[in-house]
A protein has these predicted regions:
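Flexible, glycine-/basic-rich loop-and-beta segments that form/coincide
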Residues: 1-51
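C-terminal target-recognition/interaction regions appended to catalytic cores
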Residues: 30-188
């Protein structure tokens, strides 16, 4: 791309991006009472657990036996024509997706002390995971909010890019890494 004389391009030196977040989901999950109707009933929870592969089932067994409560996210996938659930092994969320076009919403799995509870992730949790936890969700239906934050660009990523690239570029203070190549005559 940079060597194509038909494209006007430039490069700029950027600092090393922050280290990826590898934990903290439990800090962002809403504290929802065990009696809240958003938690799935026993039949739906059983269907979830029954759909797990042996690897997933073992993961859930280990988490269930552990002391204290842990949170994980889960996705519904189709494997060999059958809908199954996959639970993340770590304390982070998977990619937030919109619930359209074949993608699915994430479920929150609360597990530990021999208990398992499952529910859909809330719009507030989607917002928190995207760095917009204080965003006013008033007036938006839950599915609108999920759609708005699913497949979006996370606020911290945009802030870093703005501070380290866009604002210096606008101010003309970004150092050039390579010469800007002139546009070739387009014949227009």
């Amino acid at each position: 791309v940079y060597g194509d004389p038909n494209l006007r391009t430039h490069r700029a030196p950027l600092p090393t991006p922050p280290i990826p977040v590898t934990s903290g989901l439990g800090n962002l999950v809403e504290d929802i009472a065990s009696s809240d109707g958003r938690w799935w009933d026993s039949a739906r929870t059983k269907a979830f657990l029954d759909s797990l592969s042996p690897t997933q089932r073992e993961r859930m067994t280990q988490l269930r036996r552990g002391s204290g409560v842990k949170y994980r996210t889960a996705y519904r996938r189709t494997r060999h024509g059958v809908a199954v659930w996959e639970v993340r092994p770590d304390d982070v969320s998977g990619c937030l997706r919109t619930a359209r076009g074949g993608s699915s919403k994430q479920a929150v799995v609360k597990v530990g002390n021999q208990r398992v509870q499952i529910r859909w992730m809330t719009p507030r949790e989607y917002a928190r995971l995207m760095g917009a936890g204080d965003y006013n969700l008033g007036g938006a239906r839950p599915n609108q909010a999920l759609f708005g934050f699913g497949d979006a660009v996370a606020v911290p990523a945009v802030e870093w890019l703005a501070a380290n690239y866009l604002i210096p570029l606008i101010k003309g203070t970004i150092p050039q890494m390579a010469e800007t190549l002139p546009l070739a005559a387009s014949g227009v």
